[in-house]
Design a protein with these regions (language model features):
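Noncatalytic, beta-rich nucleic-acid-contacting surfaces in large DNA/RNA-processing enzymes
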Residues: 1-172
Length: 172
């Protein structure tokens, strides 16, 4: 019993004194339940989605119930002034949430729904070799599918990457 109390005190200490680190650890452990398309929005949008799910609580799957728990924690985190930075092609980790600063946490690639751990790791491995010059280069070097490219595009990860490796005469 002493071990459980000691662990609870440690967790509580981190939640109060190092909240960004606490939330990073919590979300990383439960990354399979995290959905960046929902949780990366505004506090009002997350609350609205939470209320929708609460109203249909009889029809929820276990994954939806787990997502609701994460939603509660994200809302709490946002109320404490800590925000989620979007997935970034050059800064995000494959599976771990990262503390950017005391008030910002960056989401990993696998926070995007449908982007698995293997695909996320292949993106990280490829970007460590050299920067991506285009979406075509990203796809060729990582071997990820067109649907995952679309997922990255929807998540805002591709920024200003051109579609093709070829440059045009007027692109300068």
């Amino acid at each position: 019993a002493v071990a459980y109390v000691t662990m609870a005190l440690r967790i509580a200490w981190y939640k109060v004194h190092r909240p960004a680190a606490y939330y990073c650890a919590y979300y990383t452990v439960r990354a399979d339940c995290f959905d960046a398309s929902i949780l990366g929005g505004t506090q009002e949008a997350i609350r609205g989605r939470y209320k929708e799910m609460e109203e249909n609580s009889k029809d929820l799957t276990q994954k939806d119930k787990d997502l609701m728990i994460i939603m509660e924690l994200v809302i709490e985190m946002l109320c404490r002034g800590i925000k989620l930075a979007p997935v970034d092609l050059y800064k995000s980790d494959a599976t771990k949430f990262q503390v950017v600063d005391e008030k910002t946490i960056r989401m990993p690639f696998n926070a995007l729904p449908g982007l698995g751990e293997a695909a996320a790791q292949s993106i990280v491995d490829a970007r460590e070799q050299s920067p991506f010059i285009s979406i075509e280069d990203l796809r060729n070097r990582t071997k990820i599918s067109a649907s995952l490219i679309d997922l990255l595009r929807e998540g805002g990860c591709l920024g200003g990457l051109p579609e093709s490796n070829q440059t045009t005469l007027f692109s300068f």
